[in-house]
Amino acid sequence: MKQISLFLTVSVILILTSCRTRTTNNALKRGEKLKSSINSFEKNRKKLSSKVVSSLEEAKESLTAENPDLPEVSKDFEKQWRSIMKRYNKMKGDFEDIGTNSRKYFGELDELSSNIHNEKLRTEELAKNKALKGKWEKIYKEAEVSVNKVTTVLESGNDFHMVLVASSIRQKLEQNVTELTNIAEQAKALLSELEVFTQQGRQLVEG
């Protein structure tokens, strides 16, 4: 009877240890996934920012040249803008992944803290998790506003292409150049703002 009791006790300890180890591993994996999605977002943000600025500057230079070939400029711009939208969709997908992975990350973190036996310590750790989650959600929502603004700016780029095509028939340039400058400035500013989100996200997962 004593042997059975001892066996059951050891079995329970092993099961609990296994569960805790699995929870710890899951939390670590979630942290790595979140970090990876943040890094991917930053990579695509940088590439998008560079691509937007260079493409718009190139288009502006072509438009302000003497006797510009508008049909040719329009074709080149369309090609560049397709590449920009492709990169933007990657960045936006990464941003959505960050949201998903961060929710799972905090879920694993709470589960890990919930396994603390000492009630006072457990309560303190869960409170820390809650405070960190609140801070993160604020940062994420602010970044979401910027991402949506980037969407609006890039839609302006799509509209600009349509105007450019029409202008290639009408041969009107002055307004186009001004509009192009505005789009470039807005895109550059918004994409720079998102760098702050990346930095804060990295601080979250790296401690």
Please provide the spans of the model-predicted regions:
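Sec-dependent signal peptide recognition
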Residues: 2-9
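Long, hydrophobic alpha-helical segments that serve as membrane-spanning/inserting helices
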Residues: 48-58, 65, 189-207
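Surface-exposed acidic loop/strand-edge motifs in secreted or periplasmic proteins
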Residues: 70-116, 120
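Extended amphipathic alpha-helical interaction segments
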Residues: 98-179, 190-199, 203
